[in-house]
Amino acid sequence: MQVILFILLLIPALVLKPRPLQPYGALPSERQLAWQETEVYGLIHFTPTTFENKEWGYGDADPAVFNPAHFDADQIVGAAKSGGLKGLILVAKHHDGFCLWPTQTTSYNISKSPWKNGEGDLVREVEQACRKAGLKFGIYCSPWDRNNAQYGTPDYLETYRNQLKELYSRYGTLFMSWHDGANGGDGYYGGAREKRKIDNTVYYDWEHTWNDLTRKMQPSANIFSDIGWDVRWVGNEKGYAAETHWATFNPVPESGPKAVPGNVNTRTSSEGTRHGDHWIPAECDVPLRPGWFYHPEQDGKEKSVDQLFELYLKSVGRGACLDLGLAPTTEGLLHTNDVQILGEFGNKLKNTFKTN
């Protein structure tokens, strides 16, 4: 009788196979996990706008103003590394449209400047300095172009995509492709000096750009924008995420019709979406100084080490990453104040977390 009972109890165990474990909800990709481990990185703003002492270039600056006599990529990268930064993103083109590499897409580029007699490539120098120092390297290329006469037409979109192709193919593996949500407004536009408005829900055709270019040419690059696809903007430029921060996010705004950079559910960007459909953690961006570009009148107004550490705890400590804006002077160097603060911040991070 006991044998029969044992057999009867054994039959279900033999017949019923355990179900394989199923993932719960949205999950991170390998590229996103690599980004998460970066924790703190920097965003370098350095264009003719620096020499104009502005925050937003209009697109009409003479390339001749761009001449950083003592530019030293190693100094900038070294200071960033001493601050505990593990990567740098270079603004290769800001809204003013000036390209820091010798592009074939527009004459408004570094080859028309007197720097290195027009033979320089600032993107190359920063990229090589990052590789040498062991830092990751990424690219920011503004979709809005206040210099280009064709901005707002289909022809400009082809120009922008060709700029991305050049950047993706010339400067090695990128850890981020950074896309700003600012687009459309007044500008030089080849001399028109007018205001132009575009429908950002359709004009850039981001799905095509990111799928056909970024994913194919730079598969390891995390796409950053208001909506991701990989990393989302936190919704402020103060350097912190909400106390409750979900890596999952539903980016479509309440007003619809779809989410694109510049048209996103910013009300929940800082917190994210509990049980959200997409894994899109937040980047918390903030400049070391009051502005993203260098302004001599802001010397002495840099964030303190204690302020930076508090931002670290409110960004990285909440499951996001911290993107710290660095602004070289017109000499092409980080100011000594910035270098000192970065070094002290890096030491504070080391001393605080040296014991696990």
Predicted segments — roles?
Residues 16-356:
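Mature catalytic domains of secreted/periplasmic carbohydrate-active enzymes
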Residues 1-9:
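Sec-dependent signal peptide recognition
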Residues 8-17:
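Hydrophobic h-region of N-terminal signal peptides that target proteins for export
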